[in-house]
């Protein structure tokens, strides 16, 4: 499979070209008011992602990535480690956020666990540029989701300090996302 076809496939899989976006262009989002439990669950979801992502660099112990990809993965891991440390003691209006209560139904959490196992198997079975592209595509998904979640959290959290922190982490993740796309482009040109 050519690198160009692989890149296009990765873009499709990561949701960059959804059929809705291709058909209708971008749309303005509707602003929805969250309940107090929604904000707590949003933080719990973010905490769960940070919990997993802070260790993504452990994959580099058993798999070899190119030097630029490995450096980027380590930076992603460090950033999620910082986010995890910030979220761990987080409270809203004096109430500690329950990190295990993300509000997702069992069908969703079971499906997410299965997807994670499948992606791990895929990563372990790949090597070279194909491994780099596959690994980077998983990070596109995680960073895009986390960034969107942080944006919504910043809109809804009544604490100005929490809003500022959410927006600061969103900027960091968006910066990492930009670096990932640059690395994917370099890999595609090299292939």
Residue ranges and their predicted role:
Residues 1-7:
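Bacterial N-terminal signal peptides that target proteins for export
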Residues 8-16:
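Bacterial N-terminal signal peptides
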Residues 22-191:
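His/Met- and acidic-residue-enriched segments that coordinate or traffic transition-metal cofactors
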């Amino acid at each position: 499979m050519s690198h160009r076809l692989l890149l296009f496939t990765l873009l499709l899989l990561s949701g960059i070209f959804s059929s809705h976006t291709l058909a209708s262009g971008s749309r303005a989002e509707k602003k929805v008011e969250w309940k107090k439990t929604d904000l707590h669950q949003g933080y719990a979801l973010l905490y769960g992602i940070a919990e997993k992502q802070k260790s993504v660099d452990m994959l580099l112990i058993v798999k070899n990535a190119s030097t630029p990809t490995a450096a980027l993965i380590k930076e992603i891991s460090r950033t999620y480690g910082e986010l995890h440390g910030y979220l761990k003691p987080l409270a809203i209006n004096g109430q500690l956020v329950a990190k295990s209560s993300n509000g997702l139904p069992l069908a969703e959490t079971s499906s997410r666990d299965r997807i994670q196992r499948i992606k791990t198997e895929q990563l372990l079975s790949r090597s070279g540029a194909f491994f780099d592209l596959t690994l980077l595509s998983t990070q596109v998904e995680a960073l895009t989701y986390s960034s969107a979640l942080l944006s919504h959290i910043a809109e809804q959290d009544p604490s100005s300090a929490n809003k500022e922190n959410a927006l600061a982490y969103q900027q960091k993740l968006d910066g990492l996302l930009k670096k990932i796309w640059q690395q994917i482009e370099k890999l595609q040109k090299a292939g």
